[in-house]
Swiss-Prot record:
InterPro entries: SfsA, SfsA_C, SfsA_N. Disulfide bonds: none annotated. It holds the Pfam family SfsA. The gene is sfsA. It comes from the Bacteria. Belongs to the SfsA family. GO terms for molecular function: DNA binding. HAMAP family: SfsA. It comes from Synechococcus sp. (strain CC9902). This is Sugar fermentation stimulation protein homolog.
Length: 249
């Protein structure tokens, strides 16, 4: 089921990514362009010089770069290549579209309003990705604080987050636990590749995040790993994925 549709992306080959935000890409006509890379992390397992990539051309006087790197072709869990979404600015919009399409109605119940980037937490210095107001028919009338995490790192068919130490991610888990029990707290790993079958915390990359993740589950934070397929002109819903059984740290 397509959730986001857009003009077909252009394909190229990744030459290199550098200074975190920049990537040199050779287009099919041989032209080399510099594209914005919104993903500032290590991009473990999805950053492969020479790989096929897809990028969006959107020149504007307000933008320094006319190109944005959107997708990367990566080795899939079944040995076949698949496409991963690497633009970390996109998942919030994608998850909002998922909710509005009713894909999570069984888990969240009826929703009457969605607000983005709402201040909350300690001294209201954090911002929740999405704040959901339940509809009248929802049996649970608590507000829903929903945090989204783009997830592309894998171990076999298991999606893992994070792929590096993330103090920001640790803080988000603490803040989510802080809204309980007066509100619901939901963590949504946005599984931005179609070849994954379950989700687990990236203990190897960030043991403290893994420990806080377990604390959050015990405290009542809900985790809804949402899987998507990325194509050149659309992103489609692939369904929820379960949590993998994992040991306590």
């Amino acid at each position: 089921m397509p959730l986001l549709e857009f003009e077909p992306l252009q394909e190229g080959v990744l030459i290199k990514r550098y200074k975190r935000f920049l990537a040199d890409i050779e287009l099919s006509n041989g032209e080399v362009v510099t594209a914005h890379c919104a993903n500032t992390g290590p991009m473990t397992g999805v950053l492969i010089p020479g790989q096929r990539v897809r990028l969006r051309h959107a020149p504007s006087p307000k933008r320094k770069l006319a190109w944005t790197w959107e997708q990367a072709e990566v080795p899939g869990a079944d040995g076949q290549p698949c496409w991963a979404g690497i633009n970390t600015a996109l998942p919030n919009r994608l998850i909002r579209a998922t909710i509005e399409a009713g894909c999570l109605s069984e888990q969240l119940g009826a929703i009457s309003n969605i607000r983005a980037e709402v201040a909350y937490g300690t001294n209201r210095r954090s911002r929740i990705d999405l704040l959901l107001t339940p509809g009248e028919s929802n049996p649970d009338q608590r507000l829903i604080y929903l945090e989204v995490k783009n997830t592309t790192w894998t171990d076999g068919t298991t999606a893992l987050f994070p792929d590096t130490v993330t103090e920001r991610g640790q803080k988000h888990l603490i803040e989510l636990m802080g809204v309980l029990p007066e509100a619901r707290a939901v963590l949504v790993p946005c599984l931005s590749r179609p070849d994954v079958m379950d989700f687990a915390p990236g203990d190897e990359a960030d043991p403290r995040y893994g420990s806080l993740f377990r604390d959050a589950l015990e405290a009542g934070v809900e985790v809804l790993p949402c899987c998507f397929r990325y194509q050149s002109n659309e992103i489609s819903w692939q369904g929820l994925r379960p949590l993998k059984k994992f040991q306590n740290l």
